Amino acid sequence: MPMKNSTLNQLVENDKQMALKDFRQIPGVGKSISEDLWNLGLRSVSDLENQDPEALYTRLSALQGTHVDRCMLYVFRCAVYYASNDVHDAELLKWWNWKD
């Protein structure tokens, strides 16, 4: 018997909420940026491993149809660093330390 749309929608929403919570463990990532990561098609912190922060930034700008503040690139650099390394330098977990 096929799932009802409401059941499927609830499953998707549950998955989304779990992913958003997962993203918020990354320093500098809150509700808004976790939504941006979801909208980029990422579903877990591990999806950020070895991603190109510049490409994520460019894709987000295209998705939103506007220029995104450059600080978002710095957050993406920090997030990719966090996801790609098991041991972290505390200074590199501050997004502002990823400026050009």
PLM regions and their residue ranges:
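C-terminal extensions
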Residues: P2-P27, K31-D100
